[in-house]
């Protein structure tokens, strides 16, 4: 296919137009007084959102060159969202400012590579300034403040997320689901839970609720099918002699083995529940290993030369309680060694860092949470489906931002931290075009606060000058329209969000500034229209239908 090739200023100007089209659509959502964006959907009701990344993801431009610029800035918001969960609009505004100011200088004859070096040095100085201002999160109130701000100042969501983190810990799994009612609620499941229920309903201990509850049981973890009774009989006898219940987790329990377990359970000879192992393939092996470490047992695996009939009580796991219903199994207070559990948690965290697959990362995070203790589910309720989707997106954003805050601490919000980072950038000793590159960042750092106040209906430049003159953490709260200490007022951002927004914006900004050539597919003017000849006449033979 033929290509369109554009050079120098022509290429950069087109990219800039695309950048501005996307950024101008995204930046109206910034701040507590940010406006809504309504997005048309092919099917169903339109989406109404104040989430920058949701707006950015919807934008595709007709002109291929402009679209390239827009897609590059879209990368800024999606990358920031992936890393920190919030700050997408801030990142887009920073990128727009860096690109606009930078291209003015490139057009005026500045060397793009020298500008890039200056930008990189200025960003490093600004990031150090952000990290110095960061305050570690100590209490539930701080967590609630961060979550509320990320959820567009919704205190209900903020408090729910703070409660969830309080109950399951900062590494615990918190999932967000749609509720069946209009209430937004929090449910917490303690211990490790996986989505496999009992193999036979005859194993339940409470026929009314159809749940099997076993106190202080032994747990047999086996990675193959159990069908022969002779493999299982001696372990059942040993457990019965010990006077304890037994939980069997294996690929499958069937045939005479299942019949024997059911008969002995009904006769009350032994209390035993069999469940299928969670997951599939290699992931199943890993999850069985997790359960073994959590309960202090071993996976009886024929791959390692172990035989089921040779299993001893010492190889079985233990837990304070196991509850099994039709669909889920929950292991509460497994009796594994804390040191081994922590080692396994560290190993999974390393795998999360190393994996490139989004799906694998999600599954690893689920495993991490199950080991780290507890699963909290936030059920998001709303009156309409449109509101439900918008609210659910805000809860997910707030959750990610809160995790980021716990990780790297919080800084004053409202664009103040970026503005104060100007001091660090201004003190750099640079010459020539490198100094110009640093000035580009210096100017960009005041754009978020300018936009927040502009969206609140005030003159941004006036607020920026006042904010520069203020000391400490005093800034302008656009929600209450007063000057106050931002941290005490609860107007805070996670340091990781602010840092990621600046670094990602500078990265893409530098890429566009150093672009000299663009290559796009030339539109094929002679392409036949697939719908040609189908219009006007209707379908033959259908004339009598009118």
Curated annotation (Swiss-Prot):
**Carries keyword ATP-binding?**
yes
Enzyme Commission numbers on file: 5.6.1.7
Catalysed reaction, written as an equation: ATP + H2O + a folded polypeptide = ADP + phosphate + an unfolded polypeptide
So which domain of life are we looking at? Bacteria
Where does it mainly reside? cytoplasm
GO CC list: GroEL-GroES complex
Coiled-coil zones? none
Please give the biological process terms from Gene Ontology that the record holds. Answer: chaperone cofactor-dependent protein refolding; protein refolding; response to heat
Q: Name one GO molecular function term.
A: ATP binding
Location in the cell: Cytoplasm
Enzyme class per UniProt: isomerase
Tell me where the transmembrane regions lie.
none
Residues the record lists as binding ATP: 29-32, 50, 86-90, 414, 477-479, 493
The subunit structure is: Forms a cylinder of 14 subunits composed of two heptameric rings stacked back-to-back. Interacts with the co-chaperonin GroES.
Q: What is this protein called?
A: Chaperonin GroEL
